[in-house]
């Protein structure tokens, strides 16, 4: 689980708590759940999101950049904080 600053480039509606795109980070591509700090993000919004990979953990570093997508939805982000596994 990690925190990230994201920018929503395109999305047909709103990104809400529980949104599940595929996150592409380095060589990893994994489904993840998004939990926006503000409750929702609209296209063009920039915000803080808590992200959790659905199936397996990955090694992350603060500052890494990633892309997320699902259908027509696309966005980019930067890892800002990492929660310890537990």
Label for each model-derived stretch:
Residues 1-86:
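C-terminal effector/interaction modules appended to NTPase cores
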């Amino acid at each position: 689980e990690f925190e990230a600053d994201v920018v929503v480039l395109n999305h047909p509606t709103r990104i809400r708590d529980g949104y599940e795109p595929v996150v592409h980070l380095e060589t990893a591509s994994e489904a993840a759940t998004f939990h926006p700090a503000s409750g929702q993000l609209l296209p063009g919004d920039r915000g803080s999101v808590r992200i959790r990979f659905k199936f397996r953990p990955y090694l992350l570093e603060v500052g890494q950049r990633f892309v997320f997508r699902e259908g027509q939805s696309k966005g980019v982000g930067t890892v800002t904080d990492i929660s310890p596994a537990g």
